[in-house]
From Swiss-Prot:
Top EC class, one word: lyase
UniProt remark on cofactor binding: Binds 1 prenylated FMN per subunit.
Subunit structure: Homohexamer.
Reaction(s) catalysed (UniProt annotation): a 4-hydroxy-3-(all-trans-polyprenyl)benzoate + H(+) = a 2-(all-trans-polyprenyl)phenol + CO2
Top-level division of the source organism's lineage: Bacteria
GO biological process: ubiquinone biosynthetic process
Protein name as catalogued: 3-octaprenyl-4-hydroxybenzoate carboxy-lyase
Native species: Actinobacillus pleuropneumoniae serotype 5b (strain L20)
Length: 487
């Protein structure tokens, strides 16, 4: 099923028992995060807090708190179907011309989906039913959550930030946390390699001292939200990919105060600019690592206009030690990564980012090993092929007889097939998430690759061990009599 807007999606979730409305008064200060955390950890539903303490606007949390709801948001029934999306992205990343008529016919479904990529611009949109400007702009009237006791201030966590560089035709959508520091001021925390930060950097070089236009959409339709967190090719717009997910063009409308296009059905849109000369100290905040992060200076987003739907819904989340919503998203989107990696490295059988690895910091890869040194090539490929794995600290490579998603299997492979001196690869002075305080320098640290594969001639001078295998005839015989044994 496809959803035109967030409200359609919520109606579907409620019909499936995947959304609960809470009518009791709940405080956005700490209480909503505590309730959301407990609900997510038990695999519970999305939550609509209808009576936030001190506010009139309802708050939506835990929307993508299970892999099933992530898949539903992408128009699929379960996460296994997300591999088909990964195949489509792999095709779009490096399309190959058909080698014959039969192959051309086989590619027609993919090209048909591409027809849904261009967005549709509306002159009148629901997201602009209410328009606030000037002194009417008051961010403190939004029920922005304060998630952890040690957090410095309330935090906008699910805003889709829309930017455009001076030399790019496409607009970029990214999700960056934004600290509330004034009635019309937010701190825009974006890492230097992210699309919004790159657009801003190019703008500053091309337009010194001129304000950089920014719009932030809160509560967009699920396809657009998820497009912003999916590893799409750099040349593809998130709006275009949302159209592919939805099976129909993404509807957008021009912002009131700038030329940026925003999701037409968004619940709330913040419009404004970033002054290249204005920064503020951001944090500390409890983050997806399970720790409070260090403080750092980031640009300040000045909000000049707020537009919204009548009876708008504020969409929010919290981050903390896994599992949290980003970890669940990472677990589901793991299935999207696999076909993209396999297109470049066909020897990869499976690829897994364990949620407890803070979404992306550790990866387990299983391969059909073909030559000595193969595991190291795959390590280097994972670190370099997709920008999403720039910050992955640990890559463990195993043979295809190991289940990448079973820690018992992976640990067995490491302890029996790996010599620490020979089979660990250390790389110094590589990019690391600045939130990773374990690195000696903020933003710069090391990576480790672990080769837990069986060793080939040239990799060892010893005779390699032969794994124990059960006699299939005995296994079959015991299967037949098992129920009679009373065990």
């Amino acid at each position: 099923m496809k959803y035109k807007d967030l409200r359609e999606f919520l109606t579907l979730l409620e019909g499936q028992g995947e959304l609960v409305r809470i009518k009791q008064e709940i405080d956005p200060y700490l209480e909503m995060a505590e309730i959301s955390d407990r609900t997510l950890r038990k695999g519970g539903p999305a939550i609509l807090f209808e009576n936030p303490k001190g506010y009139r606007m309802p708050v939506l949390c835990n929307l993508f708190g299970t892999p099933k709801r992530v898949a539903l948001g992408m128009g699929q029934e379960d996460t296994h179907a997300l591999r088909e999306l990964g195949k489509l992205l792999a095709f779009l990343k490096e399309p190959e011309p058909p080698k014959g008529f039969k192959e051309l016919i086989g590619q027609l479904p993919q090209w048909k989906q591409v027809l849904n990529m261009p967005s549709k611009v509306l002159g009148k949109a629901d997201c602009q039913q209410v328009v606030l400007s000037g002194d009417e702009v008051e961010l403190y009237k939004l029920p922005i959550m304060h998630c952890h006791e040690g957090d410095v201030a309330p935090l906008v966590a699910w805003g889709l930030t829309i930017t455009q560089g001076p030399y790019k035709k496409r607009q970029n959508l990214g999700i960056y946390r934004q600290q509330l520091i004034g009635k019309n001021k937010l701190i825009m925390r974006w890492l230097s390699h992210r699309g919004g930060a790159l657009d801003f950097h190019e703008w500053k070089e091309a337009n010194p001292d001129k304000p950089f236009p920014v719009s932030v959409a809160i509560g967009a339709d699920p396809a657009t939200i998820l497009a912003a967190v999916t590893p799409i090719p750099d040349t593809l717009s998130e709006y275009a990919f949302a159209g592919l997910l939805r099976g129909q063009k993404t509807e957008v409308t021009k912002s009131i105060s700038n030329d940026l296009e925003v999701p037409a059905s968004a619940e709330i849109v913040l419009e404004g600019y970033i002054d290249p000369n204005e920064t503020a100290l951001e944090g500390p905040y409890g983050d997806h690592t399970g720790y409070y992060n260090e403080q750092e200076y980031f640009p300040v987003f000045t909000v000049t206009h707020i537009t919204m739907r009548r009876d708008a819904i504020y969409h929010s989340t919290y981050t903390g030690r896994p599992p949290d919503e980003p970890a669940v998203l990472g677990e589901a989107l793991n299935e999207v990564f696999i076909p993209i990696l396999q297109k470049q490295f066909p020897e990869i059988v499976d690829f897994y980012l364990p949620p407890e690895g803070c979404s992306y910091r550790l990866a387990v890869v299983t391969i059909k090993k073909q030559y000595a040194g193969h595991a190291k090539r795959v390590m280097m490929g994972v670190w370099s092929f997709l920008r999403q794995f720039m910050y992955t600290k640990f890559v463990i490579v195993c043979d295809d007889d190991v289940n990448a998603r079973d820690w018992k299997d992976v640990i067995w492979a490491i302890t029996t097939r790996c010599d620490p001196s020979r089979d660990t690869t250390l790389i110094d002075h590589t990019p690391i998430d600045y939130l990773d305080f374990a690195s000696p320098i903020a933003g710069l640290g090391s990576k480790m690759g672990i080769d837990a594969t069986n060793k080939w001639p040239g990799e060892t001078s010893r005779e390699w061990g032969t794994p124990i295998k059960k006699d299939p005839n005995v296994v079959k015989r015991v299967d037949e009599i098992w129920d009679q044994l009373g065990l």
